[in-house]
C-alpha cells in the first residue's frame, strides 16, 4: 500500500531525482518514490495514449477492396452498390485524414451518398455494416418524422443528437460518424408547382437539411425535442459527418422513361417502355430526382447515387443462409441452446423467399415469415424433452402447418402441437 513519507531525510523521487523538499508530495512504494509532478506527467501520457487508441480506427483506414470484402460477409448481392459505397466511403475518410496544414490549394469536398432501391433491398444494412467496418458512431433517422423548424415533428438537429448519443457524447468521435436518413423520397416536394400551403414536411425539410449535409456548426438540444431560448446547446461541426440517404423512390422509373422517350433520338416512347426497371434505374440522372421532387440545392449535396436491385428468389435464399449473421444460422443457434437441431429444406427456403417477394417486403420480411412458422415450436419445445430435431418444410411455410418434429431415435413425432 502506498503511503506518504515525511519522517525520513534525503528522500528523492526515483523518476526525476528531485528531493522531497523540492516537490509538494512524495509517494513511497516498495523501495521507490514518486513525486506529484511525475504523477501528473504519467497521467498526461496515459490520456494521450488512450486518445490515440480511440482514433486508431481512422488512422488505419481500410482500402476499398477491404471495405467491400467486409460488406460481402454480411450483405449478399448488390455488387455495384457495394463497390460504389466502398470507394465513396474510402475517399470520404481519406479526405478527413488529409485535413490539416495544406500543401497545395486543392480542397477536397465532402460527397454524401444516396441509395435508391426498393424496400428490403439492403439499404439500411449496407449503411450499418459500413459504420461497423470503420468503427465509427452510427445513427439512423426517418425522414418522415422530420418537419421544418416551428412545426409539430422533429427538428433536423435531433438527427445529430442520435449520433452524439451513439458516440457516448464524445463530440470528436461524433463529428466523424455516419448518419443514415431513411425514406428520403418521402420529403420530395409534393408537386413542381408552388402552392400557398406551406410544405413543412417536404421542401421545408429539404431546406433544413441542406446546411448539415454541406457542413455547419449546429446547435443541438441535449435532451432532444424543440430548442428553448434558455437551453444550453451542444455544438457539433457536421463538415466531416458522412450522410447516407436512402429511399425507394417509387415511380421514378416513369420519370426516367419520360426523359428517355423525349431525348433518345430514333426511339419512340413505346420503345422506351421496353426498358426493364433495373435498366431504367441504372440511367437515373439528377434531373430525374429533381422532377421527382427534390430541390436542385439538395441534389447538389448528394453527388453519389448507388442503385440497389430488387432481390429475386435466389438472392433471398442466399441472404437466408450465407451471411455471418444469416437468419437460418441465428434460429439454428437459438434452438441449439435448447438442445434441438433445426433444419430448413431447400423447398422451405424457396417458399420463404417467394412469400417475401409476394408481400413486397424483400429481405426485411424474411425474419417475420420464419418467426410465424416457428413461434409455436419455440413456445412448446423447451418444455418437451422428446423433441430433438425440427424440420421446416415448404408445407410449413405455404400451408402454415406445424414443422416436422423428431425424437432422439429419428422417429417422426405426431405433427399435432407438442405438449409439455
UniProtKB/Swiss-Prot annotation:
Keywords: ATP-binding, Chaperone, Metal-binding, Nucleotide-binding, Zinc. Residues 1-54 form the ClpX-type ZB domain. ATP binds at residues 118-125. PROSITE patterns: CLPX_ZB (PS51902). One of its GO terms (biological process) is proteolysis involved in protein catabolic process. Coiled coil: none annotated. One of its GO terms (molecular function) is protein dimerization activity. The keyword Chaperone applies. One of its GO terms (cellular component) is HslUV protease complex. Zn(2+) binds at residues 13, 16, 35, 38. Belongs to the ClpX chaperone family. ATP-dependent specificity component of the Clp protease. It directs the protease to specific substrates. Can perform chaperone functions in the absence of ClpP. Component of the ClpX-ClpP complex. Forms a hexameric ring that, in the presence of ATP, binds to fourteen ClpP subunits assembled into a disk-like structure with a central cavity, resembling the structure of eukaryotic proteasomes. This is ATP-dependent Clp protease ATP-binding subunit ClpX. It comes from Staphylococcus aureus (strain MSSA476). The gene is clpX.
Amino acid at each position: 500500500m502506498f503511503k506518504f513519507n515525511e519522517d525520513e531525510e534525503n528522500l528523492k523521487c526515483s523518476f526525476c531525482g528531485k528531493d522531497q523538499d523540492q516537490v509538494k508530495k512524495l509517494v513511497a512504494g516498495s523501495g521507490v518514490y514518486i513525486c506529484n509532478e511525475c504523477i501528473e506527467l504519467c497521467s498526461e501520457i496515459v490520456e494521450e495514449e488512450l486518445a490515440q487508441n480511440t482514433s486508431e480506427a481512422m488512422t488505419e483506414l481500410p482500402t476499398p477492396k477491404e471495405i467491400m470484402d467486409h460488406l460481402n460477409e454480411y450483405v449478399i448481392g448488390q455488387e455495384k452498390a457495394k463497390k460504389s459505397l466502398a470507394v465513396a466511403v474510402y475517399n470520404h475518410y481519406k479526405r478527413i485524414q488529409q485535413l490539416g496544414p495544406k500543401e497545395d490549394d486543392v480542397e477536397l469536398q465532402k460527397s454524401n451518398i444516396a441509395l435508391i432501391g426498393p424496400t428490403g433491398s439492403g439499404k439500411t444494412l449496407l449503411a450499418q455494416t459500413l459504420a461497423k467496418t470503420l468503427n465509427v458512431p452510427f445513427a439512423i433517422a426517418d425522414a418522415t418524422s422530420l418537419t421544418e423548424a416551428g412545426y409539430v415533428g422533429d427538428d433536423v438537429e435531433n438527427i445529430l443528437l442520435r449520433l452524439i448519443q451513439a458516440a457516448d457524447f464524445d463530440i470528436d468521435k461524433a463529428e466523424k460518424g455516419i448518419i443514415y436518413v431513411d425514406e428520403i423520397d418521402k420529403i420530395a416536394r409534393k408537386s413542381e408547382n408552388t402552392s400557398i400551403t406551406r410544405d413543412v414536411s417536404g421542401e421545408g425539410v429539404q431546406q433544413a437539411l441542406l446546411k448539415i449535409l454541406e457542413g455547419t456548426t449546429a446547435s443541438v438540444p441535449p435532451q432532444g425535442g424543440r430548442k428553448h431560448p434558455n437551453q444550453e446547446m451542444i455544438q457539433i461541426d457536421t463538415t466531416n459527418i458522412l450522410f447516407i440517404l436512402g429511399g425507394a423512390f417509387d415511380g421514378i422509373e416513369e420519370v426516367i422513361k419520360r426523359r428517355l422517350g423525349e431525348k433518345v433520338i430514333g426511339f419512340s416512347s413505346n420503345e422506351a417502355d421496353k426498358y426493364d426497371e433495373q435498366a431504367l434505374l441504372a440511367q437515373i440522372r439528377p434531373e430525374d430526382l429533381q422532377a421527382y421532387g427534390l430541390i436542385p440545392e439538395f441534389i447538389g449535396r448528394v453527388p453519389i447515387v448507388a442503385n440497389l436491385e430488387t432481390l429475386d428468389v435466389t438472392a433471398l435464399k442466399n441472404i437466408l443462409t450465407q451471411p455471418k449473421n444469416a437468419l437460418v444460422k441465428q434460429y439454428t443457434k437459438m434452438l441449439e441452446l435448447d438442445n434441438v437441431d433445426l433444419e430448413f429444406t431447400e423447398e422451405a427456403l424457396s417458399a420463404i423467399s417467394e412469400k417475401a417477394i409476394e408481400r413486397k417486403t424483400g429481405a426485411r420480411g424474411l425474419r417475420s415469415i420464419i418467426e410465424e412458422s416457428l413461434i409455436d415450436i419455440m413456445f412448446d419445445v423447451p418444455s418437451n424433452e422428446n423433441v430433438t430435431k425440427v424440420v421446416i418444410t415448404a408445407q410449413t411455410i405455404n400451408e402454415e402447418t406445424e414443422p416436422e418434429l423428431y425424437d432422439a431415435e429419428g422417429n417422426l413425432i405426431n405433427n399435432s402441437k407438442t405438449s409439455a
